[in-house]
Amino acid sequence: MVVLDGKKLSQEIKAELKTKVEQYKQEIQKVPGLTVIIVGEDPASQVYVRNKAKSCNEIGMASEVIELPASTSQEELLKKIADLNHNPNVHGILVQQPLPKHIDEFAVTLAIAPEKDVDGFHPENVGRLVLGHLDKCFVSCTPFGIIEILKRYNIETKGKHCVIVGRSNIVGKPMANLMVQKLAYMNCTVTVCHSATPDIATYTKQADILIAAIGKARFITGDMIKAGAVVIDVGINRIEATNTKSGYRLVGDVDFEAASQKASAITPVPGGVGPMTISMLLANTMKSFEHFLA
C-alpha cells in the first residue's frame, strides 16, 4: 500500500517554481505577483491566507494580503478588485471565502478578470475546463492538485471507474469535469455521488479511484472500498482529541486505518491533498505571469 505523500510532492513543485522565479528575476527583473483579499476576521481564513503568503515568500513570488473590515460594502470590494485587475504587477487575485453575508460571492467571482482568476472559479475558466481547453484556463486548485498527485505517482486512470463523493463547485464538479477529459491521468468513467444518492456504498465499492470530498469525518469506512482502489481523501475535519495540546486533531472524510487495509494507494490527512492545493495556486499564478509575458 502506497501513501500518496502530498506534502513531499508540494515541496518538489515549490522547488521547481522557485527555480523558475529566480530565472525570471535574473533575466527580466520581474516576478509573479499574487494578491489575496480577506474580508472580516474569520480565524480559519486568516490561517489559510497566512499560509498562502508564506508559500509565496518561500519561492520568491511577490505577495500582498489586503485585509478589509467585515463592514466593507460590496461596492468597495468590487472597486478594490477592479484596481487589481488593472495592476500589471498583479498576476493572481484571490478573494478568501467565506465572505460576510451582505456580499454576493458570485458577483465577486465575476468581478475578477478571468486571466487573473487563479482559483479557477470564474465561469469563463469553468467553461473552458468543461470544453477541455485546460491549457487556456485555470483549473480549481484542489482538483488540479489531485491530478498532479495521480501524475507524479504515475497512477493509471484510463478507462478506470472514478467515483467522486461530493458535488461542490470547489472540488466535486470540477473534479468530475477533469476526470472525463480525454487526457493522460484522466480519461475515466465517472460517477458523482452526493447527499441525495441512496446507498452511496453501492457506488464506492465499484470505484477503482475513489475521491471523497464531503466534509464528514471518516464517512468512508473500510467496507465501502474495493480492494486495490486508489483513495483520494479531500476532507479536513476537526475531531476532539484529549491527548493533543489543541484539544483536537485533523482527520479526513475516509477512515484512514481501515481504508489502508483495502486500498493500493491513499492520501493521508493531514499531508495529502491539502499541501498540493496551495502549490497549485502558486503554479496557476506562474501560468498567469507567463501568459502576461507572452
UniProtKB/Swiss-Prot annotation:
PANTHER family: C-1-TETRAHYDROFOLATE SYNTHASE, CYTOPLASMIC, C-1-TETRAHYDROFOLATE SYNTHASE, CYTOPLASMIC-RELATED
The protein's name in its UniProt record: Bifunctional protein FolD
The family this protein is said to belong to: Belongs to the tetrahydrofolate dehydrogenase/cyclohydrolase family.
Superkingdom of origin organism: Bacteria
Pathway: One-carbon metabolism; tetrahydrofolate interconversion
NCBIfam families: PRK10792.1, PRK14174.1, PRK14186.1
Gene Ontology terms: biological process: L-histidine biosynthetic process; methionine biosynthetic process; purine nucleotide biosynthetic process; tetrahydrofolate interconversion
Reaction equations catalysed: (6R)-5,10-methylene-5,6,7,8-tetrahydrofolate + NADP(+) = (6R)-5,10-methenyltetrahydrofolate + NADPH; (6R)-5,10-methenyltetrahydrofolate + H2O = (6R)-10-formyltetrahydrofolate + H(+)
Keyword list, A-Z: Amino-acid biosynthesis, Histidine biosynthesis, Hydrolase, Methionine biosynthesis, Multifunctional enzyme, NADP, One-carbon metabolism, Oxidoreductase, Purine biosynthesis
UniProt cross-references to Pfam families, sorted A to Z: THF_DHG_CYH (PF00763), THF_DHG_CYH_C (PF02882)
Gene source species: Chloroherpeton thalassium (strain ATCC 35110 / GB-78)
E.C. numbers: 1.5.1.5, 3.5.4.9
Assembly and oligomerization: Homodimer.
GO terms assigned for molecular function: methenyltetrahydrofolate cyclohydrolase activity; methylenetetrahydrofolate dehydrogenase (NADP+) activity
Protein encoded by which gene: folD
Cross-referenced InterPro entries: Aminoacid_DH-like_N_sf (IPR046346), NAD(P)-bd_dom_sf (IPR036291), THF_DH/CycHdrlase (IPR000672), THF_DH/CycHdrlase_cat_dom (IPR020630), THF_DH/CycHdrlase_CS (IPR020867), THF_DH/CycHdrlase_NAD-bd_dom (IPR020631)
Role of this protein: Catalyzes the oxidation of 5,10-methylenetetrahydrofolate to 5,10-methenyltetrahydrofolate and then the hydrolysis of 5,10-methenyltetrahydrofolate to 10-formyltetrahydrofolate.
Record's keyword annotation contains Transmembrane helix: no
List of residues binding NADP(+): 166-168, 195, 236
Gene Ontology cellular component annotations, sorted alphabetically: cytosol
